[in-house]
Amino acid sequence: MFTIACLITFLWLCFGYSLSFSPCLENGGTKEVFGDAGRLWLRGMMKNTVHALAPTIPEALFCAYQLTFAIITAALICGSFADRMKYHSMIIFIMFWHLLVYCPLAHSNWHFHGWLYQLGCLDFAGGNVVHICSGASTADNH
């Protein structure tokens, strides 16, 4: 599990936060599903910047808070891999799963431009992103 925590932390800080929560440009074609590259490698994030979803705290704190959701969701899935998948296969799967499943779902649910958010989807305490995403991915693994 520590490997998963380290892997997700690296992916989140490099790519995941930008794909999930970067301020979308109006000319972006996929702003309903993915964020843009505005925060790749946390570019443009200063100690006094804030995110529109959490305007009362620094954006770095918001990024760290959302990182905990990303780690927990990946850890929930790894519980279903016991004796079913080799270790290196699990690492590769989680890497692609995080970037292609978790990040688009987090953006769609929690970002102002996300298509589920625009439909009025309410996600209290991460139920849609964390539990539905990890549960469906776990069920698919069996």
Predicted stretch roles:
Residues M1-H142:
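Hydrophobic alpha-helical transmembrane bundles of multi-pass membrane proteins
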